[in-house]
Amino acid sequence: MNTLIAIGNEIKTYRLQAGLSQEELSKISGVERAQLSRIESGEVLGVTYATVEKIFNSLGRRLETKEIVAEEKLVIHPFVKWAGGKTQLLDVIQSHMPNDYNRYFEPFVGGGALLYRLQPDAFSINDANGELISVYECFQDDELFNMLKNELIKHENNHSEEYYYMIREMDKDAEFINLPKYIRAARMIYLNKACFNGLYRVNSKGYFNVPSGKKKIVNCFDRDNFENLRLFFKTKKSAITNQDFEKAVKNAKSGDFVYFDPPYDTWEDKDSFTSYDKNAFGKEEQKRLADVYKRLSNKGVYVILSNHNTDFIRELYKDFHINVVPAKRMINSKADGRGEVEEVLVTNYE
């Protein structure tokens, strides 16, 4: 961060020496005025070397330091298998992302594949699934993390068919919501690893109802991955929430980047899985999401949205850039429900 502040001061000094306003330098360099202002203040956490070099070149100066380079990233992967996970599409999504942005927002974080690929310095993640969010919160705290680890090892050692169903039934107890966070988090991970096809599904009452995967051995605690996850959340400026997606992005500002990966719109003739929690995400919610997308766009926020390539979604986002991408659906209770599908990446910029 000290390097960014120093370089920001250099740019401001050179700009003033050249008698240029930020608006004039923005036009010369091709870097947005608001972005330039943040760079001069040393506030942009996701700034790239190429962008700073472009500004220096526009001022007739040479950028001497090479310190603005991406630091070596931790090796991290999602701690659960999640319907709609984006591991297979990471390269495609990243190719459509803005070059620079300030904070990163992901209001439907799910398994977090894109978050771990990007590893931004400042981010805000959210999900409607409280059990999933309880896991993320355990990575923020050393004491909770250690208790989570011990609980997961206990589940591994006790695993059996009978034990699986005993743990599955826990959410039917009225006091379940009051259990310690690490217990609910460990249960969520264990069930995901031990259930059929790694499917997270709840019924209309909110009870987890996926049958056992009949596995003899279940590995819940991947030591290297979990230690890296703990280090990641410990060293970054993170905000983790469990609320409505609209509230989760209300503080996004111009220059921030929001990635929406909601429960997908469904095809009329296909079995599409969207039951991530007891609150269905139907057409009205898709419309509300599109309204939020438009408001963010009007604020100058960079936005990408993933969804199925349906007529309904294309109509909702017809005023934006719609990119069709092939994908594979990997999680479905029926084998014939998996396979090739078409998705869209909707961006509010070219």
Functional labels for PLM-detected ranges:
Residues 255-336, 340-341:
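Conserved acidic-Pro-Pro-aromatic motif
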Residues 11, 22, 33, 49-52:
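Helix-turn-helix DNA-binding elements, focusing on the entry/boundary residues of the two helices
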Residues 102-169:
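SAM cofactor-binding core of SAM-dependent methyltransferases
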Residues 30-46:
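Recognition helix of helix-turn-helix/homeodomain-like DNA-binding domains
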Residues 48-66:
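DNA major-groove recognition helix of helix-turn-helix/homeodomain DNA-binding modules
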Residues 74-88, 95, 141-259, 263-273, ...:
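SAM-dependent nucleic-acid methyltransferase catalytic core
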Residues 76-111, 116-117:
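An N-terminal domain-cap segment
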Residues 9-28:
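Short basic helix-loop element that most often maps to the first helix and adjoining turn
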